[in-house]
């Protein structure tokens, strides 16, 4: 995948210009269309790579799960080009993580073909021996009645239920309203729990234009 122009954030910063990435996924089906084991590798040009091996299981059309062991180089962001890329892009140049390895587990749910919820737990050890536990949650809503939603929660320093609203836990939400075929209005919301008693909130609005291009 290649993004020539990048994405302009609500603060006016252009993120991801000339960024490319590629990946490979080898899966071995254990139960057709339900359970497989896999090996994945992804590379972000100039920003490292990630290797993952694990298993995926689909309980039904509604629920699914994934468990894997991962090895990630510094500055690599898994799922960088995901469904939230246009609304909430990650500035790779601001990432200064150490290389790390550890376990990843997620549970997902699809509701009425419009909603997707996913909860994730990660436990990593860095190259220097530091351990970290991260809890992530995301909710996406496809465009319905001209409205779409992307919301996320992240706690990079998870240490039990008491840490869910402390230690840099972050809530983000982007609500989009389609004005016409070529533009939409977006409200960005962010809330950061610096400590259990200190909270930072911010709002921003923008108009996004989409120009159809045919080749």
Regions found by a protein language model. Name each.
Residues 1-169, 200-202:
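Signature for the C-terminal beta-barrel architecture of outer-membrane proteins
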Residues 73-90, 172-215:
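Predominantly the C-terminal beta-signal and adjacent terminal strand-loop region
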């Amino acid at each position: 995948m290649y993004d020539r122009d990048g994405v302009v954030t609500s603060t006016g910063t252009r993120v991801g210009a000339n960024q490319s990435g590629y990946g490979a996924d080898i899966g071995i089906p254990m139960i057709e269309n339900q359970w497989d084991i896999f090996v994945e590798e992804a590379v972000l040009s100039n920003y490292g790579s990630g290797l993952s091996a694990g298993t995926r299981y689909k309980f039904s059309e509604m629920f699914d799960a994934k468990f894997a062991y991962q090895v990630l180089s510094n500055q690599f962001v898994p799922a960088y080009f995901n469904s939230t890329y246009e609304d909430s892009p990650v500035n790779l140049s601001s990432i200064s993580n150490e290389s790390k390895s550890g376990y990843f587990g997620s549970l997902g749910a699809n509701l009425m073909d419009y909603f997707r919820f996913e909860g994730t737990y990660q436990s990593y050890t860095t190259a220097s021996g530091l351990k970290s536990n991260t809890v992530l949650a995301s909710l996406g809503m496809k465009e319905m009645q001209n409205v779409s939603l992307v919301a996320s929660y992240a706690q990079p320093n998870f240490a039990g239920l008491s840490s869910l609203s402390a230690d840099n836990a972050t809530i983000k939400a982007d609500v989009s309203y389609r004005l016409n075929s070529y533009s939409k209005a977006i409200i960005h919301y962010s809330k950061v729990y610096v400590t259990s008693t200190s909270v930072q909130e911010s709002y921003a609005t923008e108009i996004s234009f989409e120009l159809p291009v045919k080749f």
